[in-house]
Amino acid sequence: MAMTDSLDNALLALLAEHRLPGLSFAVIGGGQITCARGYGFADPARQVPVTADTLFQAASISKCLTALAALRLVDPGRLTLDEDVNERLRSWKIPASEFIQSERVTLRRLLSHQAGINVHGFAGYATGQPLPTLIQVLNGTLPANNSAIRVNAIPGTQPRYSGGGYTVLQQLLMDVTGQPFGDLMQEIVLQPLGLTASAFAQLLPVSLEKLAATGHDKNGQPIPGGAHSYPEMAAAGLWTTPSDLAKFALGIQDALAGQPGAILTPALAREMLTVQAGVYGLGPSITGHGLARKWFHSGRNAGFDALLLTEVETGQGVAIMTNANVNSQVINEILQAIGAMTG
């Protein structure tokens, strides 16, 4: 009880200090979720509290789940890591350019931010704004609010973070399977891992919408236009909870350990968590060496910040989600407070 009280006090103090409306976290240890809690308000105006069941936007952590979907299609041979993705794209093609004359955009390079593709991230669309199709996003045509997604560096020559690359991947997955992206993710990632409080959706189903937090800016003010929609779902479109992110991490760790019925083969799980270039694996980023090696991804959408961090060798980890934009130091303070109390 004393430990719980101390953690509560520490996190509530951080909420007050940094004008955070709310936060939620889940801790992983011993192959299970050992703790999941919520603090503050999901919607301060209506005094709706954050609980362990509150949904937040995962933002760029979406990329890790998208990467898992792609690797699940590699296993049966529907995709391969090192072929030219233009061979599989049907609805849209990567335009010819001087940059892809000798090197190609491959799935491996898309997953590890080595494809030479522009557009770091996406601003999203406030309630009432017209939503572009994915093709309009790829071409940078109205009502899309991003530049055209193009190769503007030779693939394989430099790691450069690219939400645009994951948007190409979204189109690739849809073309290869013939399924809407949200349905595909439900079928081959969310449902198999038991992520029942998660959805890749621009409009949440009613059962989940009522649990969704309201996003806020760095000053704790509600985001104008409400939670933004992200048609670039592969890069930024996941709504979820820390507990569901923890289940995802457990699924990857089970695959790494070769557990029966795991979501991936051990070989693909190892490849996913192996640095390809810079800090990037196939989806997650990797830091540290040996027993200290960790895989992680952070996320920021308008009004939401998040972090998923897992130790490769021990499987210990944590997922943190907030309904306000804060700097990375605040997330680190939250991480340290949780780590100090939970080990």
Regions found by a protein language model. Name each.
Residues 110-111, 137-138, 146, 272:
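A generic structural signal for nonpolar/aromatic side chains embedded in well-ordered alpha-helices
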